[in-house]
Amino acid sequence: FILVDSLTNNTVAAGMILGGEAAPPYTESQRPPALARVHTQVSADERSERLGQKGCTVWLTGLPAAGKSAIAFALERRLFDLKRFAMVVDPDDGLSKGVQPDGSSPWQTPELARRVTDAGLIIIFAYASPLRADREAIRDAVGSERFVEIHVNTALEARRSRDARGVYSPGHVPPGEEPPHEPDAIVSLDEHDAEEVAYELVKVLEKRGLLPSTYAL
Protein backbone atom coordinates (compact mmCIF):
# COMPACT_ATOMS: atom_id res chain seq x y z
CA PHE A 1 0.00 0.00 0.00
CA ILE A 2 1.08 3.64 -0.35
CA LEU A 3 0.19 6.79 1.56
CA VAL A 4 -0.16 9.98 -0.49
CA ASP A 5 -0.06 13.51 0.93
CA SER A 6 -3.42 15.02 -0.03
CA LEU A 7 -1.90 18.53 -0.32
CA THR A 8 1.21 17.81 -2.40
CA ASN A 9 0.23 14.48 -3.95
CA ASN A 10 3.68 13.22 -2.91
CA THR A 11 4.10 9.62 -1.80
CA VAL A 12 5.09 9.75 1.83
CA ALA A 13 5.08 6.08 2.75
CA ALA A 14 4.69 2.59 1.35
CA GLY A 15 4.32 -0.82 2.85
CA MET A 16 3.00 -4.35 2.48
CA ILE A 17 0.55 -6.28 4.60
CA LEU A 18 1.93 -9.75 5.09
CA GLY A 19 -0.99 -11.05 7.10
CA GLY A 20 -1.31 -12.16 10.65
CA GLU A 21 -2.26 -15.08 12.73
CA ALA A 22 -5.95 -15.81 12.96
CA ALA A 23 -7.49 -15.13 16.30
CA PRO A 24 -7.69 -18.31 18.33
CA PRO A 25 -11.16 -19.83 18.66
CA TYR A 26 -13.11 -19.45 21.84
CA THR A 27 -12.37 -21.97 24.52
CA GLU A 28 -15.41 -23.39 26.29
CA SER A 29 -14.72 -21.13 29.27
CA GLN A 30 -14.52 -18.04 27.05
CA ARG A 31 -17.51 -18.80 24.82
CA PRO A 32 -20.39 -16.37 25.50
CA PRO A 33 -23.52 -18.07 26.81
CA ALA A 34 -26.25 -18.68 24.25
CA LEU A 35 -29.33 -16.58 24.76
CA ALA A 36 -32.25 -18.71 25.84
CA ARG A 37 -35.33 -18.42 23.62
CA VAL A 38 -38.09 -16.52 25.34
CA HIS A 39 -41.54 -18.11 25.09
CA THR A 40 -45.03 -16.74 25.57
CA GLN A 41 -46.34 -16.68 29.11
CA VAL A 42 -49.96 -16.96 27.96
CA SER A 43 -51.27 -20.48 27.47
CA ALA A 44 -53.73 -21.57 24.79
CA ASP A 45 -56.31 -22.32 27.50
CA GLU A 46 -55.97 -18.81 28.93
CA ARG A 47 -56.47 -17.28 25.49
CA SER A 48 -59.49 -19.48 24.85
CA GLU A 49 -61.07 -18.55 28.17
CA ARG A 50 -60.48 -14.83 27.62
CA LEU A 51 -61.66 -14.75 23.99
CA GLY A 52 -64.45 -17.30 24.27
CA GLN A 53 -63.16 -19.22 21.28
CA LYS A 54 -60.32 -21.46 20.17
CA GLY A 55 -57.87 -20.19 17.61
CA CYS A 56 -58.23 -21.87 14.24
CA THR A 57 -57.62 -21.54 10.52
CA VAL A 58 -60.67 -21.61 8.25
CA TRP A 59 -59.55 -22.41 4.71
CA LEU A 60 -62.00 -21.69 1.89
CA THR A 61 -60.88 -23.48 -1.25
CA GLY A 62 -62.58 -23.51 -4.62
CA LEU A 63 -62.33 -22.43 -8.23
CA PRO A 64 -62.04 -18.74 -9.20
CA ALA A 65 -65.21 -16.67 -8.80
CA ALA A 66 -66.84 -19.36 -6.65
CA GLY A 67 -67.52 -16.77 -3.94
CA LYS A 68 -64.75 -17.53 -1.46
CA SER A 69 -64.07 -13.88 -0.61
CA ALA A 70 -67.76 -13.03 -0.25
CA ILE A 71 -68.23 -15.95 2.12
CA ALA A 72 -65.05 -15.15 4.05
CA PHE A 73 -66.08 -11.56 4.76
CA ALA A 74 -69.64 -12.59 5.57
CA LEU A 75 -68.27 -15.11 8.07
CA GLU A 76 -66.00 -12.45 9.58
CA ARG A 77 -69.03 -10.16 9.97
CA ARG A 78 -71.12 -12.93 11.51
CA LEU A 79 -68.39 -13.79 14.01
CA PHE A 80 -67.90 -10.12 14.88
CA ASP A 81 -71.63 -9.75 15.57
CA LEU A 82 -71.31 -12.76 17.89
CA LYS A 83 -68.46 -10.96 19.70
CA ARG A 84 -65.86 -13.34 18.29
CA PHE A 85 -62.45 -12.34 16.93
CA ALA A 86 -61.63 -13.15 13.31
CA MET A 87 -59.73 -11.77 10.34
CA VAL A 88 -59.74 -12.46 6.59
CA VAL A 89 -56.77 -12.98 4.27
CA ASP A 90 -58.01 -12.32 0.75
CA PRO A 91 -56.21 -12.66 -2.63
CA ASP A 92 -56.59 -8.93 -3.27
CA ASP A 93 -54.76 -7.73 -0.16
CA GLY A 94 -51.05 -7.16 0.29
CA LEU A 95 -50.52 -10.32 2.32
CA SER A 96 -51.33 -12.37 -0.76
CA LYS A 97 -48.51 -11.07 -2.93
CA GLY A 98 -46.46 -14.01 -4.04
CA VAL A 99 -49.22 -16.40 -5.05
CA GLN A 100 -47.54 -18.91 -7.37
CA PRO A 101 -48.52 -19.43 -11.04
CA ASP A 102 -50.11 -22.77 -10.13
CA GLY A 103 -52.24 -21.04 -7.50
CA SER A 104 -50.15 -22.18 -4.53
CA SER A 105 -50.16 -19.89 -1.53
CA PRO A 106 -47.28 -17.49 -0.79
CA TRP A 107 -44.41 -19.20 1.03
CA GLN A 108 -45.11 -17.38 4.31
CA THR A 109 -48.76 -18.49 4.51
CA PRO A 110 -48.28 -21.54 6.81
CA GLU A 111 -46.34 -19.44 9.33
CA LEU A 112 -48.92 -16.66 9.18
CA ALA A 113 -51.73 -19.15 9.76
CA ARG A 114 -49.90 -20.77 12.68
CA ARG A 115 -49.06 -17.52 14.44
CA VAL A 116 -52.52 -16.02 14.19
CA THR A 117 -54.08 -19.32 15.28
CA ASP A 118 -51.66 -19.54 18.21
CA ALA A 119 -52.81 -16.06 19.24
CA GLY A 120 -56.31 -17.46 19.69
CA LEU A 121 -57.87 -15.74 16.67
CA ILE A 122 -59.88 -17.23 13.82
CA ILE A 123 -58.08 -16.55 10.55
CA ILE A 124 -60.10 -17.06 7.37
CA PHE A 125 -58.27 -17.61 4.08
CA ALA A 126 -60.02 -17.13 0.73
CA TYR A 127 -57.36 -18.56 -1.57
CA ALA A 128 -58.15 -20.73 -4.59
CA SER A 129 -55.37 -23.11 -3.49
CA PRO A 130 -56.18 -25.74 -6.14
CA LEU A 131 -53.40 -28.12 -5.07
CA ARG A 132 -54.17 -30.54 -2.26
CA ALA A 133 -50.53 -30.55 -1.10
CA ASP A 134 -50.69 -26.78 -0.61
CA ARG A 135 -53.65 -27.09 1.72
CA GLU A 136 -52.08 -30.00 3.59
CA ALA A 137 -49.04 -27.82 4.29
CA ILE A 138 -51.34 -25.39 6.11
CA ARG A 139 -52.99 -28.25 8.01
CA ASP A 140 -49.57 -29.52 9.09
CA ALA A 141 -48.54 -26.04 10.23
CA VAL A 142 -51.54 -25.33 12.46
CA GLY A 143 -52.53 -28.89 13.38
CA SER A 144 -55.53 -30.88 12.17
CA GLU A 145 -57.54 -30.03 15.28
CA ARG A 146 -57.30 -26.31 14.41
CA PHE A 147 -57.74 -26.54 10.62
CA VAL A 148 -61.21 -26.20 9.08
CA GLU A 149 -61.39 -26.92 5.35
CA ILE A 150 -64.39 -25.62 3.41
CA HIS A 151 -64.93 -26.48 -0.25
CA VAL A 152 -66.76 -23.70 -2.10
CA ASN A 153 -68.27 -25.69 -4.96
CA THR A 154 -70.33 -23.11 -6.84
CA ALA A 155 -71.61 -24.21 -10.26
CA LEU A 156 -69.91 -23.11 -13.48
CA GLU A 157 -72.71 -20.82 -14.68
CA ALA A 158 -72.73 -18.98 -11.36
CA ARG A 159 -68.95 -18.66 -11.46
CA ARG A 160 -69.13 -17.21 -14.96
CA SER A 161 -71.69 -14.66 -13.85
CA ARG A 162 -69.40 -13.62 -10.97
CA ASP A 163 -66.19 -13.63 -13.04
CA ALA A 164 -64.64 -10.15 -12.97
CA ARG A 165 -61.18 -11.17 -14.20
CA GLY A 166 -62.09 -12.98 -17.40
CA VAL A 167 -60.98 -16.36 -16.09
CA TYR A 168 -63.83 -18.07 -17.91
CA SER A 169 -63.63 -15.97 -21.08
CA PRO A 170 -63.47 -17.79 -24.43
CA GLY A 171 -59.91 -18.78 -25.25
CA HIS A 172 -58.83 -19.16 -21.64
CA VAL A 173 -57.85 -22.58 -20.35
CA PRO A 174 -60.47 -23.56 -17.75
CA PRO A 175 -58.95 -23.64 -14.27
CA GLY A 176 -58.74 -26.97 -12.50
CA GLU A 177 -58.49 -28.07 -8.90
CA GLU A 178 -57.82 -31.02 -6.64
CA PRO A 179 -60.94 -30.95 -4.45
CA PRO A 180 -60.65 -31.90 -0.78
CA HIS A 181 -61.20 -35.56 0.07
CA GLU A 182 -63.03 -34.91 3.34
CA PRO A 183 -63.80 -31.20 3.81
CA ASP A 184 -65.59 -30.04 6.94
CA ALA A 185 -68.31 -28.65 4.68
CA ILE A 186 -69.20 -28.23 1.01
CA VAL A 187 -70.99 -24.96 0.27
CA SER A 188 -71.97 -22.91 -2.77
CA LEU A 189 -73.65 -19.68 -3.77
CA ASP A 190 -75.96 -21.41 -6.23
CA GLU A 191 -79.06 -21.18 -4.04
CA HIS A 192 -77.83 -19.34 -0.94
CA ASP A 193 -76.22 -15.97 -0.38
CA ALA A 194 -72.92 -15.46 1.44
CA GLU A 195 -74.63 -14.50 4.71
CA GLU A 196 -76.64 -17.73 4.76
CA VAL A 197 -73.50 -19.76 4.10
CA ALA A 198 -71.67 -17.88 6.86
CA TYR A 199 -74.42 -18.83 9.32
CA GLU A 200 -73.92 -22.50 8.43
CA LEU A 201 -70.15 -22.20 8.82
CA VAL A 202 -70.58 -20.91 12.37
CA LYS A 203 -72.37 -24.18 13.07
CA VAL A 204 -69.39 -26.05 11.60
CA LEU A 205 -67.08 -24.23 14.01
CA GLU A 206 -69.38 -25.16 16.87
CA LYS A 207 -69.43 -28.80 15.84
CA ARG A 208 -65.64 -28.82 15.83
CA GLY A 209 -65.62 -27.42 19.35
CA LEU A 210 -63.97 -24.16 18.29
CA LEU A 211 -66.93 -21.98 19.31
CA PRO A 212 -69.44 -22.36 22.14
CA SER A 213 -72.69 -23.73 20.73
CA THR A 214 -74.80 -20.92 22.15
CA TYR A 215 -73.24 -18.38 19.82
CA ALA A 216 -75.01 -19.64 16.70
CA LEU A 217 -78.46 -18.95 18.16
Regions found by a protein language model. Give the residues of each.
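Hydrophobic, well-ordered secondary-structure elements that form the walls
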Residues: 9, 124, 159
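P-loop (Walker A) phosphate-binding loop of NTP-binding proteins
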Residues: 63
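Glycine-rich phosphate-binding loop used to anchor ATP phosphates in small-molecule kinases
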Residues: 97-156, 168-170
